[in-house]
Amino acid sequence: SNSSYYMDPYAFWMPTEGSQAAGLEAASRAIRYAKNHGVVNIAAEGNDNDDHDNPTIDKASPNDVEGAAVERNVAGGVDVPAMLNDSVVSVSAVALPTGTDPATAKLERSKFSNYGKTSVDVAAPGSRIWSTLPTWKKDPPFGYLSGTSMASPHAAGVAALIKEIHPDYTAD
């Protein structure tokens, strides 16, 4: 789950706050639409090391204005889109521990990745992934990147392979 570009202005949206109902509904409809049209990869949650099973304090709300952040109780809050509905597959990033043999090592949760036994569905490699670099880093055009944005394409690829073998399967 990656909050690099979470749905402003809150990292966690509260279903009980009337002012946030329209935003939650819009996100929910967009995800339903995407689900009905096939596999979609959204890397939009953040590398906040949050426990999605037990959200407590939202330190980045609202995050649009520097210095305007306020802490608020977000128990029962929703991190959009990862926690929005059952059609969303929430991905956590994992990595090989430093200095271990890839053939025998056990993967560990990447230190930046969000987590939760009931709110994260799958884990995929997300640390030190060889990838194309952003356009502003043109020399060289490839390098190592880390983040759940690196893990979610792995999960989407597996979902696409499963869909190829089982075309009758749905996102549910």
Give short role names for the model-derived ranges:
Residues 1, 124-172:
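Hydrolase catalytic cores
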Residues 1-133:
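Catalytic-core segments of hydrolase enzymes
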